[in-house]
C-alpha cells in the first residue's frame, strides 16, 4: 500500500480511537496535565492528547512495514540531530556493552530497527501489556530483522547480562513503571516510581548507558543520541542506583519534552490516588468504630527502633539475581 494512503487510513483510525477510547484518553490527559501544569480542559492538553493518538496509529502502521525496510531506507529516513553513532562505537571499545535507554516517544520501534540496521547486535527488553496473541505478533514483527526480543523475566535478564558481557547492545524503555515496584523519583516535579533496571544492570556490568530518542517529522525521523552515562559501583547498592536514577531522570524529561505531542504513553505515569492505609480490623468489624478511633488518637504513639528508616522498595536489590520485574 502506498505510504500516503497508509498514513491517511492510520490518521483516520487514530482520530476515531481518540474519540472512542475514553479511559486511555483520560490517562493521556492526566500525564500531559502533569507535565504541562495545565488543566485537563485546556485546549493545549486536548490537542496534545489527540496528537498522541494519531502518532500511535502511525506507529502501528510503521510497525507493519519497518521489518521489511532496507538499511539504506533507514539511512535515508533518519537524521541524527544530536550526538553521533560514533558515541556508540566509542562506548563499545570499552568491551562492556551498551544499554540504550529510551521512552515511548515518536516511533520508538524505529529506534530498535535503526540501531540494528547500523550493524549493532541488539537485544530489546519488552514487557507484555496486552493479550498474549497480540504481544506475540508484535514481538515477531519487531524481531524479524534479527533483533533478539526478551521479556523482563529471570531468563530474559540473564540473556541481557550475557549480551552485555559479549559487548553487545541492549534497549530498554524507562518512562513508566509498568510493574509498580520501581525506584521512587521526582519526575517532572511530581513523585512517582520508574524502573531502575537499566541503571542497576549498568552498575553491575559496567555497561555504558546511552539515552536515545526519536521524533517523527514530515520527511522521516529525527534521532537524538545523548551522551553516555557510567554508573559508579560502590558497596552501597541502593545509593548507587539512586544516584544513577538521579542522573537519568532529567535526560528522560528532556527527551519527552522535546516531542511531548508524540509521547505515546497510555497508562498513568503518576498515581493520583494514594494507596489505602493498612486496616487494624476487618471491614465491618464492631471494633472498627469512630469511638475507638478517637481513643486511639489520644494514646501515645509507639515507635520501633528502626521506624525512622524508609520502607524498603522491592526490586533494587534483585536485578543481579535475575528478578526482572523492575526492568
Short names for language-model regions:
Residues 1-102, 139, 144-146, 292-306, ...:
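Membrane-anchoring hydrophobic helices of lipid-metabolizing enzymes
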Residues 25-27, 128-132, 191-195:
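Active-site metal-coordination segments of metallo-dependent hydrolases
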Residues 27, 86, 110, 137, ...:
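Short Gly/charged-rich anion-binding patches and loops
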Residues 31, 109, 175:
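Acidic active-site catalytic centers that drive phospho-/nucleotidyl reactions
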Residues 38, 46-50, 92-94, 117, ...:
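Non-catalytic C-terminal accessory region of glycerolipid acyltransferases
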Residues 60, 69, 94-154, 180-185:
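Catalytic core of membrane glycerolipid acyltransferases/transacylases, capturing the structured
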Residues 78-81, 131, 150-154, 191-192, ...:
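A conditional alpha-helix N-cap/helix-loop micro-motif detector
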Amino acid at each position: 500500500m502506498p505510504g500516503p494512503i497508509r498514513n491517511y487510513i492510520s490518521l483516520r483510525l487514530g482520530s476515531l480511537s481518540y474519540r472512542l477510547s475514553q479511559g486511555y484518553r483520560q490517562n493521556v490527559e492526566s500525564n500531559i496535565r502533569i507535565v504541562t501544569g495545565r488543566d485537563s480542559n485546556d485546549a493545549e492538553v486536548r490537542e496534545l492528547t489527540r496528537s498522541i493518538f494519531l502518532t500511535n496509529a502511525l506507529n502501528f502502521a510503521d510497525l507493519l512495514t519497518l521489518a521489511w525496510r532496507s538499511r539504506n531506507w533507514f539511512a535515508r529516513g533518519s537524521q541524527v540531530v544530536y550526538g553521533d553513532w560514533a558515541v556508540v562505537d566509542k562506548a563499545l571499545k570499552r568491551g562492556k556493552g551498551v544499554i540504550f535507554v529510551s521512552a515511548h516517544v515518536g516511533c520508538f520501534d524505529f529506534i530498535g530497527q535503526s540501531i540494528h540496521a547500523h550493524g549493532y547486535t541488539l537485544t530489546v527488553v519488552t514487557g507484555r501489556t496486552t493479550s498474549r496473541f497480540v504481544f506475540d505478533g508484535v514481538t515477531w514483527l519487531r524481531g524479524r530483522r534479527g533483533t533478539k526480543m526478551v521479556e523482563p523475566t529471570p531468563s530474559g535478564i540473564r540473556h541481557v547480562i550475557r549480551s552485555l558481557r559479549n559487548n553487545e547492545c541492549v534497549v530498554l524503555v524507562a518512562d513508566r513503571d509498568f510493574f509498580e515496584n520501581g525506584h521512587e523519583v521526582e519526575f517532572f516535579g511530581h513523585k512517582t516510581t520508574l524502573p531502575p533496571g537499566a541503571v542497576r544492570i549498568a552498575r553491575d556490568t559496567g555497561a555504558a548507558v546511552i539515552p536515545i530518542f526519536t521524533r517523527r517529522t514530515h520527511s522521516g525521523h529525527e534521532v537524538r543520541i545523548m551522551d553516555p552515562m557510567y554508573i559508579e559501583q560502590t558497596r552501597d547498592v541502593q545509593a548507587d542506583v539512586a544516584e544513577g536514577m538521579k542522573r537519568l531522570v532529567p535526560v528522560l524529561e528532556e527527551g519527552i519534552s522535546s516531542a511531548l505531542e508524540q509521547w505515546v504513553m497510555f497508562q498513568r505515569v503518576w498515581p493520583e490516588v494514594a494507596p489505602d492505609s493498612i486496616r487494624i480490623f476487618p471491614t465491618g468489624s464492631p471494633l472498627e468504630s469512630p469511638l475507638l478511633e478517637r481513643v486511639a488518637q489520644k494514646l501515645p504513639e509507639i515507635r520501633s527502633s528502626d521506624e525512622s528508616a524508609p520502607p524498603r522498595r522491592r526490586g533494587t536489590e534483585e536485578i543481579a539475581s535475575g528478578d526482572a520485574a523492575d526492568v
